[in-house]
């Protein structure tokens, strides 16, 4: 019976991949905006710049897995995300099955059609790779394959930095389960990447010393509302699934209360596996709430980071489906109708609240427009050095962003005496005054620069920091 069900699930996932692939192909835009484009560029230029495979912001494991697909363009990178999502759904389903959930297949729908995760599939973002590694590791743990689980989970920090948040809790779980030898393999990823990176950075501690978020304070605003991510549930899980998730979480708390009376150490393996899943989800939630509240470690307060732990959230939601399902054990058809109705509402919520296919955002559209103007202007010269920050410029202006002869960061334009004559400066009101800390007047009023073109959207809108979005193209005299 289980083998037959697995075959059905594989067929359904193959169909899901086909549907997701079609959706990302017809979508010109992407979730994550500039971050998504930048992750694509890191992978796209790996053949020319192998050191990209060790870039901490790009995330080494994510860039490695994305590279073969990125050679086919940005759409190829999004195809990777669709494939990774379907593999993640398989691991999530198998984990639910191992945990004894009769409604394990529901976990696939709850994962793929949680609004945030569904949106992130149409991107080149690291959250998808993080979810893939996490789901594989959790599945291996519940399958009692602790050695290989440790190896897989040791790679989490190289998919996203939050891996360093989850690893201590995973390590404690291993020690409490007396898996002492497998515990040692949890450090394999850090050791391996430290040794590989040493030959490039000449720093055995590069994994920690080159963390791009360790001293990033003050770039983004802080929040006085600690529970911001809790309030973001309509985007993260969607309203229907949030209700199911709450039921699943309450079901776990009741099980925890029962286990605490007899001793948690005496509880069975399924409960201990559930405890790990819930603790990891809570650790992730509180860690992000803290760094956003205090404005540390480069937190921008983005809800999309929770796509990385969506397999955990989907499993808790699947537990909620199970709690709804069990009271109707007397009637198989009624159970099936109830579950199908709930899942239909979950899927419907996504398509009712989001438009598909996804088109380019207003910032990206204006950047592409400016790129078309530049390439058709008399100022365009192949290989000309361009100073910019917005990653979309690398695509729109046909620039290799990792070639220092073609590209430099916008903040370098502050010192005009160091800018070669004829160089182009692409200043946009998103990154210019925020990440680069340069006001447009600083360049406008500099006699060494001339303004070539100003791009203003037909329908004005504000960007990060409350600035009216515009693009200014300057040339160094």
Residue ranges of model-derived segments:
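Signature aromatic-anchored transmembrane alpha helix within multi-pass, membrane-resident enzymes
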Residues: 10-13, 187-191, 257, 263-266, ...
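Hydrophobic, aromatic-rich transmembrane alpha-helices
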Residues: 89-92, 171, 237-278
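Transmembrane-helix motifs of polytopic, lipid-linked glycan transferases
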Residues: 76-101, 132, 136
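Specific aromatic-rich, kink-prone transmembrane helix
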Residues: 89-94, 110, 114, 129-152, ...
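Membrane-lumen/periplasm interface segments of specific transmembrane helices
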Residues: 38, 180-249, 281-288
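Membrane-embedded, lumen/periplasm-facing catalytic core of multi-pass transferases
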Residues: 47, 337, 341-401, 405-409, ...
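Hydrophobic/aromatic-rich transmembrane helices and adjacent perimembrane loops
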Residues: 127, 165, 276, 295-326
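Short acidic/glycine- and proline-prone juxtamembrane loop motifs at membrane-interface regions
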Residues: 119-129
């Amino acid at each position: 019976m289980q083998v037959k069900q697995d075959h059905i699930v594989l067929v359904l996932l193959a169909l899901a991949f086909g549907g997701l692939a079609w959706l990302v192909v017809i979508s010109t835009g992407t979730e994550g905006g500039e971050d998504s484009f930048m992750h694509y560029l890191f992978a796209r230029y790996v053949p020319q710049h192998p050191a990209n495979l060790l870039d901490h912001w790009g995330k080494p494991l994510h860039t490695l897995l994305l590279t073969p697909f990125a050679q086919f363009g940005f759409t190829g990178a999004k195809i990777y995300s669709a494939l990774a999502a379907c593999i993640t759904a398989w691991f999530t389903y198998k984990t639910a099955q191992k945990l004894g959930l009769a409604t394990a297949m529901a976990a696939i729908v709850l994962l793929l059609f949680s609004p945030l995760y569904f949106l992130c599939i149409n991107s080149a973002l690291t959250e998808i790779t993080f979810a893939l590694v996490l789901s594989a590791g959790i599945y291996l743990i519940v399958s009692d394959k602790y050695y290989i689980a440790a190896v897989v989970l040791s790679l989490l920090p190289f998919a996203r930095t939050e891996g360093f948040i989850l690893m201590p809790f995973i390590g404690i779980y291993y020690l409490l389960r007396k898996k002492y030898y497998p515990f040692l393999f949890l450090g394999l990823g850090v050791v391996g990447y430290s040794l590989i990176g040493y030959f490039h950075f000449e720093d055995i501690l590069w994994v920690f010393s080159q963390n791009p978020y360790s001293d990033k304070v003050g770039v983004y605003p802080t929040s006085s509302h600690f529970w911001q991510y809790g309030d973001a549930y309509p985007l993260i899980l969607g309203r229907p699934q949030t209700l199911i998730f709450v039921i699943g979480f309450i079901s776990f708390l009741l099980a925890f209360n029962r286990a605490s009376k007899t001793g948690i150490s005496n509880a069975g393996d399924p409960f201990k596996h559930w405890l790990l899943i819930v603790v990891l989800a809570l650790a992730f939630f509180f860690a992000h709430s803290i760094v956003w509240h205090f404005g540390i470690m480069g937190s921008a307060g983005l809800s999309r980071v929770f796509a990385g732990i969506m397999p955990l959230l989907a499993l808790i939601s699947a537990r909620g489906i199970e709690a709804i399902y069990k009271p109707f054990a007397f009637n198989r058809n009624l159970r099936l109708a109830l579950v199908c109705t709930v899942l239909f509402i979950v899927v419907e919520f996504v398509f009712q609240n989001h438009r598909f296919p996804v088109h380019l955002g207003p910032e990206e559209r204006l950047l592409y427009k400016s790129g078309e103007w530049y390439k058709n202007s008399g100022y365009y010269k192949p290989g000309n050095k361009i100073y910019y920050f917005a990653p979309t410029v690398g695509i729109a202006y046909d620039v290799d962003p990792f070639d220092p002869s073609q590209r430099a960061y916008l903040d370098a334009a502050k010192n005009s005496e160091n800018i070669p004559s004829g160089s182009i400066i692409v200043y946009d009101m998103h990154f210019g005054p925020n990440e680069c800390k340069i006001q447009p007047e600083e360049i406008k009023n500099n006699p060494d620069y001339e303004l070539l073109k100003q791009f203003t959207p037909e329908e004005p809108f504000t960007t990060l920091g409350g600035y009216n979005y515009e693009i200014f193209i300057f040339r160094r005299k």
